[in-house]
């Protein structure tokens, strides 16, 4: 095993050891309570944010990554429902993005629950979050490892499923039937004149 693989494994182990089961369950409860989940991330954090979105969508949760550059679109999405029905998941590691921090502060100020995936308890987004999970992301003195965040996302998805938050088989069957009917509406050749 090469030294970088060992370092990645140690980073993941450190992350899993540093987050209690209670913290992980609190994060999954926040997911369960939210009608809509918003994910904010920038630069390095966008990869784990995309993976988190993929995993949450596979659990049939309503979520989206916010485009931090499209402020009017962000505002439209965030204001489409009462703030208490949403959840902002802020993902940030050094250098912390000003837009991610500003959005986190805004959501906290309007009463939207905030959860954070970050590297330190004193990170700017952790100060605004009700639930914070810490990830070891530094290898060889640089922020360059997202293995621990991806591992933590997988852990959260499994916990969500194991704590009965995932759709039942009956719900999945009904959704699959609706999906097939939806697809069949578009399977006929276009007959418009």
Show where each model-derived region lies:
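Glycine-rich phosphate-binding "P-loop"
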Residues: 7-16
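Hydrophobic packing residues in well-ordered alpha-helices of helical domains and bundles
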Residues: 5, 24, 49, 171-172
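Short, small-residue-biased leader/transition segments that mark boundaries at the very start
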Residues: 1-3
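A short, well-structured juxtamembrane/interface segment
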Residues: 15-33
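Glycine-rich phosphate-binding loops that contact phosphosugars or nucleotide phosphates
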Residues: 35-151, 155-165
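A short, charged, Gly/Pro-tolerant segment at domain boundaries
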Residues: 166-193
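Bacterial carbohydrate/catabolite-sensing allosteric modules
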Residues: 32-34, 58, 65, 183-193
């Amino acid at each position: 095993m090469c030294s970088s693989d060992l370092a990645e494994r140690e980073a993941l182990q450190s992350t899993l050891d540093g987050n209690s089961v209670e913290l992980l369950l609190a994060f999954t409860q926040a997911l369960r309570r939210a009608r809509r989940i918003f994910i904010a991330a920038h630069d390095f954090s966008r990869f784990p944010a995309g993976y988190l979105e993929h995993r949450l969508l596979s659990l049939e949760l309503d979520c989206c990554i916010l485009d931090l550059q499209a402020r009017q679109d962000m505002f439209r999405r965030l204001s489409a429902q009462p703030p208490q029905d949403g959840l902002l998941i802020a993902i940030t590691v050094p250098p912390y993005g000003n837009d991610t921090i500003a959005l986190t502060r805004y959501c906290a100020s309007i009463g939207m629950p905030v959860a954070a995936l970050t590297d330190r308890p004193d990170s700017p987004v952790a100060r605004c979050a009700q639930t914070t999970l810490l990830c070891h992301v530094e290898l060889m003195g640089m922020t360059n490892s997202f293995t621990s965040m991806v591992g933590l996302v997988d852990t959260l998805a499994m916990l969500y499923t194991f704590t009965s938050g995932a759709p039942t088989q009956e719900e999945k069957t009904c959704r699959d039937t609706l999906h097939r009917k939806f697809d069949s509406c578009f399977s006929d050749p276009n007959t418009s004149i």
